[in-house]
Structure formats: structure tokens, C-alpha cells
Swiss-Prot record:
GO molecular function, one term: magnesium ion binding
Pfam families (UniProt xref): ACPS
Keyword Metal-binding attributed: yes
Name of the encoding gene: acpS
Designated name of the protein: Holo-[acyl-carrier-protein] synthase
Any Gene Ontology CC annotation: cytoplasm
Organism: Alkaliphilus oremlandii (strain OhILAs)
InterPro entries: 4-PPantetheinyl_Trfase_dom, 4-PPantetheinyl_Trfase_dom_sf, ACPS, Ppantetheine-prot_Trfase_dom
Catalyzed chemical reaction(s): apo-[ACP] + CoA = holo-[ACP] + adenosine 3',5'-bisphosphate + H(+)
Length: 122
């Protein structure tokens, strides 16, 4: 049973600007595991923007948006085949558990200017 759906789109340039203007942006938004994934990519800005959109989409699927949780409470990782998956921590996990959410499915895509992600909580 679907318990929540979220979608987010972001301009890749906005992420680049946020990183340039705010020294703490990456550490505030992304876990060390996520940052390690970015280091492995050639198209790093597209990947970072996609992960940011995935966090937003996941928060929307939980029905709250980012309020009442921290960005790092939602972690977007990749399996051995490169498929993204969501790991929830702290307040995000507590909320998902209270909603009896067993899994959040995530899909991420981008073109040269935008990144988009959709999350489905089941």
C-alpha cells in the first residue's frame, strides 16, 4: 500500500551556487557516505543535485517536508548496481516507523540543467 508520494525538481546551477556561497553546505546536507559517492562521479553537480532532490522528495513522501528533521536524517545511497535507495535515521526514521512505512522507493534523473527525483513510501 502506498503511504506517501513526493517529487522534487531543482536547477543544477542552484546547487552549484549554494556550494560556492556556503562553505558548510555539503557537510550540513549530505552524510560522509553520500559525499564519498559524489567523489566517484564525473558529473558531480548533476549527482549532488539529484541527491538533494531525492532528499526533498523523500521528505514530501513522509508528509512533512524537511521540518522536524535534519537533512542528514535522509540518506540517499546506491546499491552494487548503482540503483539509489533511501536510509532513514533519527527523526525521519521515527516518523516513517510511526506511519508503518517499510520502504521508500526512489528514482532520480537529470538533464544538463535540472535534476528530478520521485519517492514512494510503501
Amino acid at each position: 500500500m502506498i503511504k506517501g508520494i513526493g517529487i522534487d525538481i531543482i536547477e543544477i546551477d542552484r546547487i552549484g551556487q549554494a556550494i560556492s556561497k556556503n562553505n558548510g553546505f555539503m557537510d550540513r546536507i549530505f552524510t560522509l557516505n553520500e559525499q564519498r559517492l559524489f567523489e566517484e562521479k564525473n558529473n558531480i553537480m548533476e549527482t549532488i543535485a539529484g541527491h538533494f532532490a531525492a532528499k526533498e522528495a523523500t521528505a514530501k513522501a513522509l508528509g512533512t517536508g524537511i521540518r522536524n528533521m535534519k537533512w542528514k536524517d535522509i540518506e540517499i545511497l546506491k546499491d552494487s548496481l548503482g540503483k539509489p535507495y533511501v536510509e532513514l535515521h533519527n527523526n525521519a526514521k521515527t516518523l516513517a516507523d510511526s506511519m508503518h512505512i517499510e520502504q521508500i522507493l526512489i528514482s532520480i534523473s537529470h538533464n544538463k540543467s535540472n535534476a528530478v527525483a520521485q519517492a514512494i513510501a510503501i
